[in-house]
Amino acid sequence: MPYIYMNITLAFVISLIGTLMYRSHLMSSLLCLEGMMLSLFTLNALLSLNMNFTLSTTVPLILLVFAACEAAVGLALLVMISNTYGLDYVQNLNLLQC
């Protein structure tokens, strides 16, 4: 396995560990999720460049669209929670249930 793939996989694992460890604040969870999506996008882009299958070039773009939607929804949720409760704790997400 080339070193670039190992580095990208390591970046994904570090972001995953960060998501699992720093779950108290929503902003840190969102940053770790963005790191995971960025490493997945980079890995998919590199793999699609190495493959000779032409339809595989659209997969990184679709993943990038999903990452942008996830970031927009996460930031909207963060703004709503911080305006309502004044804090960005993940525990406040339970208070939003009907």
Swiss-Prot record:
Localisation per UniProt entry: Mitochondrion inner membrane
Membrane topology classification: Multi-pass membrane protein
Catalytic activity: a ubiquinone + NADH + 5 H(+)(in) = a ubiquinol + NAD(+) + 4 H(+)(out)
Signal sequence extent: none
GO MF annotation terms: NADH dehydrogenase (ubiquinone) activity
Gene Ontology cellular component terms for the protein in this record: mitochondrial inner membrane; respiratory chain complex I
A Pfam cross-reference name: Oxidored_q2
Swiss-Prot/TrEMBL keywords: Electron transport, Membrane, Mitochondrion, Mitochondrion inner membrane, NAD, Respiratory chain, Translocase, Transmembrane, Transmembrane helix, Transport, Ubiquinone
Transmembrane portions of the chain: 1-21, 29-49, 61-81
EC number(s) given by UniProt: 7.1.1.2
Domain of life: Eukaryota
Top EC class, one word: translocase
Gene Ontology terms describing biological process: ATP synthesis coupled electron transport
Family classification: Belongs to the complex I subunit 4L family.
Purpose of the protein: Core subunit of the mitochondrial membrane respiratory chain NADH dehydrogenase (Complex I) which catalyzes electron transfer from NADH through the respiratory chain, using ubiquinone as an electron acceptor. Part of the enzyme membrane arm which is embedded in the lipid bilayer and involved in proton translocation.
Subunit record text: Core subunit of respiratory chain NADH dehydrogenase (Complex I) which is composed of 45 different subunits.
Record protein name field: NADH-ubiquinone oxidoreductase chain 4L
